[in-house]
């Protein structure tokens, strides 16, 4: 209901086949709806800044990757939406970069401070709370 009020279109995943498959499903749906670009931001980012998001969206590369501190993919912009296979998992930013290279695409890697911290474990949360003190108030 909240999404509908904000004009967000929800794309339901028909099967629970993992993150990469879910994003591929959404990419295909986005392309069918006429979208030329897709921005993927996982929900576990600690504190993404609007300025970093804006910088990432201004990239004119067909593939823009924002790696996490452990080389995962914390944000990905692709144009068209299905330009590369999605390879989420351990060190996925390197996998996405490799997929772009296989297709002859010069991908852009953007190391944006607010996109480096995700919350995968209690250790990640503790680190994020030290680096971004405002998170502590939200988590209390």
Region spans (language model):
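Conserved nucleotide-sugar donor-binding
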Residues: 71-84, 97-98, 122
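Domain-level recognition of soluble alpha/beta enzyme cores
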Residues: 87-89
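Short phosphate-binding loop-to-helix
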Residues: 2-37
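Conserved alpha/beta core of the MobA/IspD/sugar-nucleotide pyrophosphorylase nucleotidyltransferase superfamily
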Residues: 91-94, 98-140
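Short, high-confidence coil segments that cap the C-terminus of an alpha-helix
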Residues: 35, 60-61, 105
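Conserved donor-nucleotide/metal-binding helix-loop-beta segment in metal-dependent transferases, i.e.
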Residues: 48-71
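Acidic metal-phosphate-binding loop of nucleotide-sugar-dependent transferases
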Residues: 17, 45-47
